[in-house]
Amino acid sequence: MLVPLYEAVYTRLDVGPATRLLGLGCGSGLALLMAVSRGAAVTGVDTSAERLDLARERLLPDGRDARPGTADTRIVRGSPADAARADAPAYTVVTAFEPIGCRAGDAEGLGELLADAVPLAGRGAAVVLAGWGPPERCATASVLRVAAKLAEPLRGAGAWRPTDRDDLERVAARAGLRPDGSGRVACPFGYADVDSAVRGLESTGLFDPAVAATDQVQVHKELAEALHPHQRRDGTVWMPNVFRYLVARVP
């Protein structure tokens, strides 16, 4: 879904064989795979065992946590601090591609990740933060409100919030980073049908609080209804979105 964002950032930063990249919240590893295809050495960090299993299938098909004899590729479950190695060079690029600006507390959560990650990066390293664009330019915003409504019994856990244009800059400032440019990228979400769209959106983790507050069946039903306005005559689902990214530097 966010492939255009990954490509825009990697092109801007000239990610390649000289790059040592740390991917925060790497999920199923697609962004890491794209960096590896450019020759970068990558380390992916996430807390979801299920998503990291998918990342390992993509990047480490032999089942190891690192790929010996090639560009360093590591998958780590835990926090960025768990990826630290005394014998490893500093990272030159740190990415946080999971966009903020849709859930209460997501900016604070990103700040905590950066507190652990920035010390692992070298001076002048690029730190990339991503966020949702304005709600009026993100068709998926209306669907995310469904998650907020269903998660309401948990009061604050995963509650939807509108994005703020200065979200990324504030997070960077709190982390002691120096802004060095930004951009916007169109990332439409397209699915073959409603069921595929529901599965795809649920796999992002954005609806986990809703599932915890209700159940999987209820979330599936509500999501399908919210997606109906975005369904085309041929049955496909199409939701135009715009995402923003900020490039900041480690001083």
Residue ranges and their predicted role:
Residues 81-94:
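A short acidic, Gly/Pro-enriched loop at the edge of an enzyme's catalytic core
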Residues 35, 116-117:
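Class I S-adenosylmethionine-dependent transferase superfamily signal
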Residues 102-116:
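A short, conserved alpha-helix within the catalytic core of class I
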Residues 20-22, 28-83:
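Class I SAM-dependent methyltransferase SAM/SAH-binding core
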Residues 96-100, 130:
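Residues lining the SAM
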Residues 111-112, 118, 122-190:
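Conserved catalytic/acceptor-binding region of the Class I
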Residues 1-19:
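Conserved alpha-helix/loop element of class I SAM-dependent methyltransferases that forms part
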Residues 28, 169-251:
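Conserved Class I S-adenosyl-L-methionine
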